Amino acid sequence: MAEPGRPAREAPAASSRKTHRAPRRPRPSRSASGASEPPLRSSVQPACDSAAGTHPVGNTVAMKQKKKKTPNRVSGTNGSEKPSEKPAPDEAPPSAEAQAEQLARELAWCVEQLELGLKTQRPTPKQKEQAVGAIRTLRSEKTPLPRKRQLMRSLFGDYRAQMDAEWREALRALKAATHSAQVQLVSEATRKKSGRVCRPRPAERAKTTPDLTSEEFRFNFF
């Protein structure tokens, strides 16, 4: 119902305002096949898109896997692969002849030490008897080799180390003697002072002995 004092025409005007709506935008027309058009893209694409276009994602994954599978190889100067260095072979054991020579040197050294001890020291009769028996045992060809080595070790301990130390000491003394005996150049002044003057001898010199005669020597007492 209309209020008193207002015309009845305003009511439909208010209802017309409420029902008034904005016009809708026209929808894009679809093709006959019913497929929707692809969205519009800008003509300028970023650099990453171009790079992605040249290298697909699948190729990059395959390249990474290939890099992981290939081992790192050291190449030589000419581009060829450097062969792996083989471990150095172990030194060959000494021959039987070398072992026999080494044993002969060790036996000679031990016998020499025993003989030197008998000459330079004053052993008791018991010690002298033991040293003579050891020398006889070491020189005997019937004595087995293990028995000789056991005897040498019981007498001298580590005789090989003692032989090595003695050899080094002798080599050091020999080097010192060689160094001290080197010929040194003498200066010209020293050479003139110590030089001898050689004078020619006279052609005719007096005879020191009298002439021998064929006459018989006699005492002239009368």
Swiss-Prot record:
Q: Which domain of life is it from?
A: Eukaryota
Feature: compositional bias, Low complexity? 1-16, 29-39, 93-103
Q: Which UniProt keywords apply?
A: Acetylation, Methylation, Phosphoprotein
Q: N-acetylalanine (modified residue): where? A: A2
Region described as Disordered: 1-103, 119-146, 186-210
Q: Which residues are reported to carry the modification Omega-N-methylarginine?
A: R27
Skewed-composition ranges (Basic residues): 17-28
Phosphoserine is found on S75
Similarity annotation:
Belongs to the UPF0488 family.
Under the heading PANTHER family, the entry gives: UPF0488 PROTEIN C8ORF33 (PTHR13602:SF2)
* This protein's name: UPF0488 protein C8orf33 homolog
Origin species, per record, is Mus musculus (Mouse)
